[in-house]
UniProtKB/Swiss-Prot annotation:
Family: Belongs to the cytochrome c family.
Assembly with partners or alone: Interacts with CCMH (via N-terminus). Interacts with CCMFN2.
Family matches, as Gene3D superfamilies: Cytochrome c-like domain (1.10.760.10)
Source organism (scientific name): Arabidopsis thaliana (Mouse-ear cress)
InterPro entries found in the cross-reference section: Cyt_c-like_dom, Cyt_c-like_dom_sf, Cyt_c_1A/1B
Name by which UniProt lists this protein: Cytochrome c-1
Key word Acetylation present: yes
Gene (UniProt): CYTC-1
């Protein structure tokens, strides 16, 4: 598996397709949108895991206290349950480095505070 330093450049358009097919059933990205099964991801970058107001996180997510940035997301999205044992997220992860890079590029654009 490619490390973050070896990750390909991300394509936000391709990442949006990945988000719509693999993430949108549980997450929203728009400011003010409510939580679904997973938390709203607006303002994700620079936020500490387990801290979105109004969402009931697992103790594992709160205790991990990772700051979400590109490298952390790249590693997390490979295998969420390995990165944060005990997370409630049921998504198995994205094995392809390009898919992870694309999704991160999309999230960086779509979750930035406006």
């Amino acid at each position: 598996m490619a490390s973050f330093d070896e990750a390909p450049p991300g394509n936000a358009k391709a990442g949006e397709k990945i988000f719509r097919t693999k993430c949108a059933q549980c997450h929203t990205v728009e400011a003010g949108a409510g939580h679904k099964q997973g938390p709203n991801l607006n303002g994700l970058f620079g936020r500490q895991s387990g801290t979105t107001a109004g969402y009931s996180y697992s103790a594992a997510n709160k205790n991990k206290a990772v700051e979400w940035e590109e490298k952390a997301l790249y590693d997390y999205l490979l295998n969420p349950k390995k990165y944060i044992p005990g997370t409630k997220m049921v998504f198995p992860g994205l094995k392809k480095p390009q898919d992870r890079a694309d999704l991160i590029a999309y999230l960086k654009e779509s979750t930035a505070p406006k």
